Amino acid sequence: METTMVTELIPSLPQELGLECMTRLPYTAHRVASQVCKQWCDLLESKDFYYHRKKLGYTHKVACLVQAVHGADVLQGSKQGNSPCFGITVFDSASQTWERLDPVPNYPIELPLFCQLASCEGKLVVMGGWDPVSYEQVSHVFVYDFTTRKWREGKEMPSKRSFFAIGSYSGRVYVVGGHDENKNALRTGWVYDLSKDEWTELTQMNQERDECEGVVIGDEFWVVSGYGTDNQGAFEGDAEVYEFGSGQWRQVKKAWIPGRCPRSCVGVGKDGRLMSWADLDPMVRAGARGITLGSQVMLTGLDNQGSPEEFYLIEMKDAQNGKLEKIIVPDEFSGFVQSGCCVEI
């Protein structure tokens, strides 16, 4: 990484050594360090510095979860009845620590329902969903910076959609499929450039796909299963794959289990084939969610409807054997997990 600093990063140290020290600084100290001086702040918040840390192996993976918040279901009249409120929980598997992020802008009580998460250049991106009071679709984009510990609003999605596939690659977030305000399944897609705060339309898929799931594998974005407007709930067994290099789609047959909802439970096995996290162990067969954290996977789910949500870690090398390690979870973070993603900070 080339630096153009006029003054030394750390007094009395060569610039290269000062950069090495900053690179090794744990992400949990970035917020305090960014307040030392403008030079440190600019460095810690720069995209080049993030990729420099990533190249040298000093980034850190955490799980970000859309999770039901205990005791908040009727807070300030935000909801009627017993419908849960959702917030964003962060779990660090290395330190076994939990925290809940501050609310996103415009929604002081809870997240938009069914919003989607993606990780992009060390930041957490929240898109779409339903207004938690009116249940109308929203097109909001929110970006969380783990250095400043603050949210900002991004440019809104060009069109409102729900239950779409989402994935990120090379500083961009891809949004494809889902359904519009009239519940028509979509085959359109858009890509959001985080640095430019701009949207660009993608070439369309071959068919419409509602409630599809997005997975980035290498240089490809897989949009798994889904169903058409006239086939509600009839989940397809194929997938469409977007090649980042060519910008073209291709269809892959027999990629998924026909009739099974793919939402948040699509994984990639050791052989590179798609798999369902729900098949790993009976303990997570209902509502299974999987988040890959490097060599580990965080699994959430329950053995049957109505039982408490359980949380596990599993080593990827043992994924086919289903050797689950139970996570001890504080009560305030034991709520139902709707979806999630890994953020490499």
Language model segments and positions:
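Kelch-like beta-propeller repeat domains
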Residues: M1-I345
